[in-house]
Amino acid sequence: MDAGHVNVILGEAEDKGLRGSINLVGGAKISFDFNGIGIETSFNTNTKNRTLMIGSGSTVVFTRKYIDCSSIQYIEVFERTK
């Protein structure tokens, strides 16, 4: 997937406080939640080398994952319903 598209999709999800998952080639999934209670989630895309850094955690432990955007098959975003 193009890093620019990844940036737009995750940027919109972050703005709206949504959750979802990044589905990688081979079946692996990385979940995210931009409105998790007690959890901070952030991301950064680098369009030059086509990578995505996504991280989440608390003030004690913050985990980062670095992903080659070409290995992203699709991104699912879930709307919050009441």
Where are these regions (language model features)?
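Acidic, low-complexity, intrinsically disordered interaction modules
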Residues: 24-64
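Short glycine-rich, low-complexity segments
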Residues: 1-29, 82
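Structured surface patches comprising rigid loops and adjacent beta-strands/short helices at the edges
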Residues: 35-39, 64-80
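Intrinsically disordered, low-complexity repeat segments enriched in small/polar residues
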Residues: 10-12, 42-44, 75-78
